[in-house]
Amino acid sequence: MPKMIRKVFLYRRRWCVIIFLSSVAIFVLSLQFELNAIEVTQRKSGNDFLRGQGLTVTARLKQNRYSSMSKSKDQVYQFALNGEGEIGKGHRRLRRGRRCARTKQQETSRFRELSKGILVFSVWYDNRKTQPFIRILLLMYRNDPPPSLTCSFQIASKQTILTTEAVFYEHNENHHDRYGGFVASCIVPREVETMPCSIKVSIKSTNKAQIVRRKSLTFPVSSTDRLENTVGGKYGICVPPLHGDISVDRLVEFIELTRILGASHFTFYDLAINEEMRKALSQYETKGLVSVLEWNLPEYTRNKLHYFGQVVSILDCLYRSMRDKSFVAFHDLDEFIVPLQHDNINSLLNEIHKDYHCGHCFESVVFDPSKDSESPNVLSRDRLVTQRIFYRTSQMTPYWTKCIVDPRKIFEQGIHHISKPLEEFYQAEKVDWNIARVFHYRKCQDSHALMQLKCSAKFEVDKTMRRFGEKLTINFKIASNATNRRNS
């Protein structure tokens, strides 16, 4: 009997060893299986999908038929992704590859229709978070479920194509219109070692007959990395899409006065302007002071989105400014951010801006051009609105603010406020209106658009702009003469 018990014990011990070794082997194989590809999964139900705050997303690296790896396996590596695109710890920066060879047309962003109702304007490589991302800025039909959109990265050295699925984030100022601004974010896989010059963006759609269709376009990728040899302290201006009958005088006055106030560069979006305006902008463009991008909105969207898709132009200019601007402001041609106790915006920011600030917002007062308070003797000054109109509202417009931001610290910028800093600890400061304010030259009306400002209330004289009058008059005359020679 004892011999029998000993045999059973030895027999069971051998099987325990075999089972243990098998378990170790399975664990090692599964670990190897997990480290060869990517799957990103986030879960959150309801309409939060479109807000980008913890989405249900799957991004999988797929090997194409030319890959040396097995065609039958999609190998998976899992990690957590939040709505703004942060993954794990340890910043990963791709090295710069060879200079991307592009035509002038490829360098200039414009809307391209990926499919009906999905319009891509520009594509950016963003490495500000711990995980690099491709950010696709687009206008999209809002009433349908978000499409299945993917980014494909080609690894030339391995003849491999890696594909990740996009996460959608909706801009918060789409105002319930049918079309709105979105950011679609694709993870840059770890196998991608150099910043891509281009990516293929694909969309999968299903028609009423349940036939699956795929459409793809290749887009150039621009980088948000600081350009080499760029000088810090540059202050840029982003102007929303230009349209309508805008006079050349107003444009030149805006550029010249804003330059006196500290701006070094302007970005404009051309929706529909006259030939004289284009020639005037071209004059500044040759000097490197202005960039003009075509805003080629399809007709079918124009009455179905807020202010000609302004929010996408804001996002595009934000990303564009990350490369060589320390600060950038977003406002219209009839607005000026004016320091009251400093010589210019740069000296103001040098004093008030701290490392924990992502930006500064300024309250507005309205100067009504119908209240022509001066009759200047000089013809050139007669052409300058800011040197002629000195009656403004005594009451400020606290909700109609305009902002100056550090573009690298912003995830989402609004029209009148900073919508979302890149990191939660960054602060947006409201600047005391006795230090600086927005001078807005427009007809003053009691309206919801003006946040119910009572324009029938008291007006008062404000001749702050006289500080800049002499220099502005000289610069305006020089610029106008140059523009006239170009037009003749």
Predicted regions: what they are:
Residues 254-264:
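Short, acidic, metal-binding catalytic loop of nucleotide-sugar glycosyltransferases
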Residues 14-15, 174-178, 225-238, 242-243, ...:
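Active-site-proximal specificity loops/subdomain of glycosyltransferases
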Residues 2-225, 232, 307, 311, ...:
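Catalytic-site signature of metal-activated, phosphate-bearing donor transferases
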Residues 269-272, 296-297, 362-367:
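Acidic carboxylate-rich catalytic motifs and surrounding loops in phosphoryl-/glycosyl-chemistry enzymes
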